[in-house]
Amino acid sequence: GLGRLAACYLESMTTLEIPATGYSICYELGIFKQKIVDGQQVELPDDWLNLGDAWLMPKPQEAEEIHFGGRVRTRWDNGHLMVVHEDYTRVLAIPCDMLVAGYNTDHVNTLRLWDAKSPKPIDMQLFSQGQYLKANEERAMADSISTILYPEDNHYEGKSLRLKQQYFFVSATLQSITRQHIQTYGTLKTVSYTHLRAHETSLHL
């Protein structure tokens, strides 16, 4: 499918020794198993990370912070419009890097997969009050973003989750690209086709 096509792009660029980084979400159950039951295809979750993956290198020190929900407040300060985002839910995008080798070359590129985690594992105040499920809401919301590829979207919850996945992926990736560019060039004024090109492989998140 399109995911395989994106992998071919990255592998080909590596073979041609073109510096590139691929981005996606590190789905816990990204590839489903298929079985035939009573003549019908049945999809089952495939816990592909259960046995570990020696090729994935987590880099929590390079995590990006994504904000969901909340409200926006504006104010003027010395003639400048200030926009303040408040009361949002924080989700961390933890990068897990995989090196991609090409053919007949020593050049290596990187595939960066984002794993969604809550910076606050549990709300101890709610947990102490006996509200155990509510105490885990933020963690459950964050975990759901990178749990499974292609969640059903024939209901509101599914549409909401897909939108969160898309926003999470785009925000984390653009933050990462921006941060790396500033670290290299010291400014965003040099962002141009000379230094940066982006290609999107349209996946049905």
Provide a role label for each language-model segment.
Residues 194-201:
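Conserved small/polar residues in nucleotide/adenosyl-binding loops
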Residues 8-12, 16, 116, 170-184:
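Generic, well-ordered alpha-helical scaffold segments in large soluble proteins
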Residues 106-108, 115-135, 173-181:
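Carboxylate/His-rich catalytic cores and anion/metal-binding grooves
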Residues 37-105:
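Extended, Lys/Arg-enriched charged tracts that mediate electrostatic binding to polyanionic substrates
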Residues 10-11, 15-33:
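Glycine-rich phosphate/pyrophosphate-binding loops
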Residues 137-154, 182-188, 197:
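Active-site-adjacent bridging/hinge elements
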Residues 4-8, 108, 161-176:
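Generic recognition of stable, solvent-exposed alpha-helical segments in well-folded globular domains
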Residues 21-23, 31-32, 102-103, 121-125:
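Short helix/loop capping segments that flank catalytic or ligand/cofactor-binding pockets
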